[in-house]
Each structure stands twice: as C-alpha cells, then as structure tokens.
A protein has these predicted regions:
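C-terminal regions of mature proteins
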Residues: 129-294
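Single conserved hydrophobic/aromatic residue that forms the stacking wall/gate
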Residues: 1-6, 10
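M16 family metallopeptidases and their MPP-like homologs
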Residues: 28-38, 65-181, 202-210, 216, ...
Length: 346
C-alpha cells in the first residue's frame, strides 16, 4: 500500500511505446513517478533539487535507486530533474520493469523517502552533491561550445518568465555556501517531505511496449496528411510546392557580402601581444617533487598525480587501463564504492 494514502490522488496515465519485432513485451515497461517542484524562478530550490537527484539516484549506492534495484523493480533505475521551465519536475524512472508492479514501485520509493526524512540524509552524499555542482558551475566547461553563447542560453532559464531576472542563474556561488549550511539543519529532508511525499501535483506514468506501433502511427499520419491534401484546392497545393522550393533555395543560397560583414570578427588589435606567463614553481612535499602553477582557476584546485611506470612488466601494461577504469568504482579496505565516491566528491 502507498503510505499516507496519496497514491490515490496522483494523476495516472498509461501509454504505449513502439518496439521492434522480436523485442520482448514482458518486463519491458517504463514506470515513472513525477512531481512538479515549485517555480523555475526559485534558483536555490532548483540547485537543491539537482543535488537531491545526485544524492538519491545518481551516486553509486544512492538509496532510492538501490532500494528499487534490490526489489528487482526494473533492470535500470534513473532520475531526471527537468529545469529551465517555469514548472520544473522531478522524475524517478524504472526501465525494463513489470507494468503490474507500479504500486510496489511507488510504495518502495515513498517508504525509502520516509525513512530518509525520519533518519536524515547521508551528509557525505549531500556534501558531495553540492561540491559536484559547485565545481561544474565554477569550471563552466562547455566543451567546444563558446562560453558566452552558453551563458546567453542560460539566462533564458529565468528571463523568459521574469524580465527583471535575466541573471538569476548566473549568480549561484552564494547559493552553494548557503546549501552547505542548510544541509546540516534538515533543509533537504524538508524538501523531500514537502515536494516528494506531500506533493499532490504528481503523476504515475506507465509506458507499455507494443509491436507494430510505429507502423500504425506512420499509417495514421499518412492518412491524416492524405485527407488534408484532398481538402486543398489545386491552387493551394501549388502554393505549398512553390513555398517549399523557395525555402529550400533560400537555405542553400550563398550569403551576400553585406550579410557576411555583419558577423563580428576578431581583429589583430584584439589579440594581446604579451604571451601568457607560465608558472612552474618546483618544491618538495615529503620527498615528492611538486610543480605548482599559479594561474586563475575560479577557485578550483586541480591536482594531478603522476606515477613512474617504468618498472611495470610489458605483459601487465594493458591492465593499467583496466585499473584506471575501476579506481573509485570498487570497494576498498576502508570504504564501500558508494562511500568512496562521495568521499572523493566531498
């Protein structure tokens, strides 16, 4: 049974999704528990729920994920927090599950969350989650995408819904400091109680596999388009064809010199003539050589440990790659892999 009786008031939806011929239909459903979380303009709340998703579902041994896997609810369990919209929502999903176990799915989630509220969150997991997202925010590594472009996109997370708050999501550093203090005062447990347990703006959605559904949908679309075409006059059809050709020609044509000149470009005068100074301050710590590079890192400390491997036999060298891959993901003498993961991030 679902605790607190709230399971009866959730919106319930069952839908089908397409699978290929030969794909299993049994134990191949998706079960999801979804809750709307406050307002997208509440930056602290949104950052806090990103941390909660990490602590409850993403980190190795995360309690909600582990409880569902231990109960064999689905072959994979994951969470999502959809922000950047006015009504963000938090989802817990079991993949490759039995569609008839949705009540058990819900009961395990709620029971686990109630235990967490009663006994408290794992403080190391919270600390690790907060530090993880603070690190990502400070580093702002957008790979090959220009940082200015990505910041420009980020401002829309708040600006779309309040013209007076374009920079709300660019000013997060103080929030991480605040969350570190609030984590010790029951803040995250209160969020779980309010938004994940007592929240009635929620749904239980089940996706059931169906063979041939893609072909059915294609046939329905073709029929709909055919009916629409038959409703058009000859002139209307010719106009659609002409508009399509015009659009294709516009997309393929070369840009004019005038248009190209509107693209801002760097000038030689924009590039500094002075080279970037490299700092390689060498000193020793406990007999180990340390090279220190004093450069701006936005408050992030980077540490690289380099080991001399010349004494590793040639036949064992391939296993060094395996060792690198499992470090941090297996139990050690003093920590389980879940504890170790949080210790590293904390």
């Amino acid at each position: 049974s679902t605790s607190r009786g709230l399971g009866d008031v959730y919106k319930r939806q069952v839908h089908e999704y397409p699978v290929l011929d030969g794909d299993p239909l049994e134990n191949n459903a998706y079960l999801s528990y979804n809750m709307v979380i406050g307002s997208g303009l509440d930056v602290k709340l949104n950052v806090a729920f990103s941390v909660l998703k990490y602590a409850l579902l993403d980190a190795p041994g995360a309690p909600v994920k582990q409880a569902l896997l231990d109960a064999h609810i689905g072959k994979d369990v994951y969470g999502s927090y959809e922000d950047g919209i006015l009504q963000p929502f938090f989802s817990i999903v079991a993949k490759n599950a039995d569609e008839n176990e949705k009540e058990k799915f819900l009961s395990i989630i709620r029971g686990t969350l109630e235990d967490i509220v009663k006994n408290g969150m794992d403080q190391k997991a919270l600390e690790a989650g907060i530090n993880y997202f603070e690190f990502r925010f400070r580093e702002a590594d957008f790979s090959s995408f220009p940082k200015g472009l990505m910041y420009g996109i980020d401002v829309f997370d708040s600006w779309l819904y309040d013209e007076n708050k374009p920079f709300a999501y660019l000013q997060q550093l103080a929030i991480y400091d605040e969350l570190k203090k609030l984590a010790k005062e029951g803040y995250f447990e209160n969020l779980i109680q309010t938004y994940l347990l007592d929240n009635t703006h929620a749904s239980i959605v089940t996706l059931i596999p169906k063979t041939g559904l893609a072909a059915e949908n294609d046939a329905k679309t073709a029929e709909k388009l055919q009916k629409y075409k038959e409703s058009l006059s000859k002139e209307e059809i010719e106009k659609i064809i002409a508009d399509t050709k015009e659009l294709a020609a516009y997309q393929e044509e070369e840009e004019s010199e005038e248009a190209l000149e509107t693209i801002p470009l760097l000038k030689r005068s924009d590039i500094k003539r002075e080279s970037i100074k490299l700092y390689n301050d060498e000193h020793e710590v406990d007999g180990t050589t340390v090279l220190h590079h004093n450069v701006f890192t936005n408050g992030i400390g980077y540490l690289s440990l380099l080991f001399d491997t010349k004494n590793v036999p040639n036949d064992l060298i391939p296993y060094m790659g395996v060792l690198k891959s499992v470090l941090g993901y297996v139990d050690t003498e003093h920590y389980t892999y879940g504890e170790l993961f949080n210790e590293i991030n904390a």
